[in-house]
From Swiss-Prot:
Disulfide bonds: none annotated. It is a single-pass membrane protein. The keyword Transmembrane helix applies. It comes from Prochlorococcus marinus (strain SARG / CCMP1375 / SS120). PSII is composed of 1 copy each of membrane proteins PsbA, PsbB, PsbC, PsbD, PsbE, PsbF, PsbH, PsbI, PsbJ, PsbK, PsbL, PsbM, PsbT, PsbX, PsbY, Psb30/Ycf12, peripheral proteins PsbO, CyanoQ (PsbQ), PsbU, PsbV and a large number of cofactors. It forms dimeric complexes. The lineage of its organism: Bacteria, Bacillati, Cyanobacteriota, Cyanophyceae, Synechococcales. One of its GO terms (cellular component) is photosystem II reaction center. This is Photosystem II reaction center protein T. Keywords: Membrane, Photosynthesis, Photosystem II, Thylakoid, Transmembrane, Transmembrane helix. It holds the Pfam family PsbT. Its main location: membrane. It is found in: Cellular thylakoid membrane. GO terms for biological process: photosynthesis. Found at the monomer-monomer interface of the photosystem II (PS II) dimer, plays a role in assembly and dimerization of PSII. PSII is a light-driven water plastoquinone oxidoreductase, using light energy to abstract electrons from H(2)O, generating a proton gradient subsequently used for ATP formation. The gene is psbT. The chain crosses the membrane at residues 3-23.
């Protein structure tokens, strides 16, 4: 159960960080 909770927290952290960066500075895919 610890592994599942750890994975869930890591995923949530990565998603939160991704959205924070995306909303702060929209990525330019067309370089």
């Amino acid at each position: 159960m610890e592994a599942f909770t750890y994975t869930l927290l890591m995923t949530l952290g990565v998603v939160t960080l991704f959205f924070a960066v995306a909303f702060r500075d929209p990525p330019k895919f067309d370089k």
